[in-house]
Amino acid sequence: EATKHKVGILLPLTGRQKLLGQELLDAAQIAVFDLADENFVIYPFDTQGTETGATAAAEKAVRIGVDLILGPLLASSVRAVRPVASSVGVSVVAFSNSHEVAGDGVYILGFVPQQQVDAIVDYAVGEGLYRYAVLAPQDAYGQEVVAALKRAITVREAKIVRLEYYDPTATDFSRLAKAIADYDRRHKALLEHRAELKMRDDQVSKQTLKRLETLDTLGDVDFDAVLLPGRGQQLKAIASLLSFYDVDQPAVRLLGLSNWAQTANIEAEPSLNLSWYAAPPRDEREKFFRRYREYYGRAPAAIASLAYDATALAIVLAQSQTGLAFSRKRLVQPYGFLGVDGLFRLRSEGIAERVFEIREVTRDGFRIKRPALTTFPRIGG
């Protein structure tokens, strides 16, 4: 008789995040419809979006004998679940992107900044951009991005020449953009040069002065690219202000991460035209979101894809070869798995390694500058 595989999925099905939790559960159910046979059973457990609720949900899951836990969503909930799962040797594939909760049988499927930063910097350096400015939110995410950038540039002999943090709740970025653009010095240099030219009576000086009438600044900034890890209206506001203070593309390239892909109408902001950003390949993702809308009549949250991929991963492992389907050795298969968000593989340290394509923003969307990998290089090779 075939082995029954029990998998628990821990989600906030009540509380403030219940709608998001339901969308993740819906996505998991699509994977079951697509791939599972009668020997795969998934059991949902409500974390209530709290640490206490997550602990109770994990205890219920291990009590019925689950072989693997998918979720929870929040890093604090993952911390609460870890000791419960570890006590019975059950691995956890969580939807968090916090590397701090990864390891020792806990694998995070979320998109960690390090890999995205590495991808975009690798491409930018290949295009000759070695001097970087960065404008990051003053929070854990922003600090993680900056740390990732420091690691990425060090191995490529590039450097950070300007770094500014901003309040993640801010709406006015004028001072910040003006400072990083070194606008006051460059504007002063223009005024001084104009004054100098006005004192001359030769034709060349007069022609030069006429050309300078349309400028606000003189001289270049001391960086080749600006990393903007923000998204949405903040991203658009900062990019627009940088252009206002004479930091223009393609002379200085604006760079972004995968959250740019969730910024609505990014192509409508002229100052972001020609920017580059790292993003997961979109073909399978678009198919998944289309099917989700067909099933449920609404568009899911962006991270719903993680629940689909985690469930699909569990089903594939359950259906292949005999033995311990969800052992750590099998979870970290070096060839990886092809998911909604592209190729990924779980690493022994508990982080999902992912592939990214490099996109350039255009007036009607984007063009792919470098496609994502379709196979992983050998680990350690």
Label the predicted regions.
Residues E1-G381:
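Extracytosolic ligand-binding ectodomains
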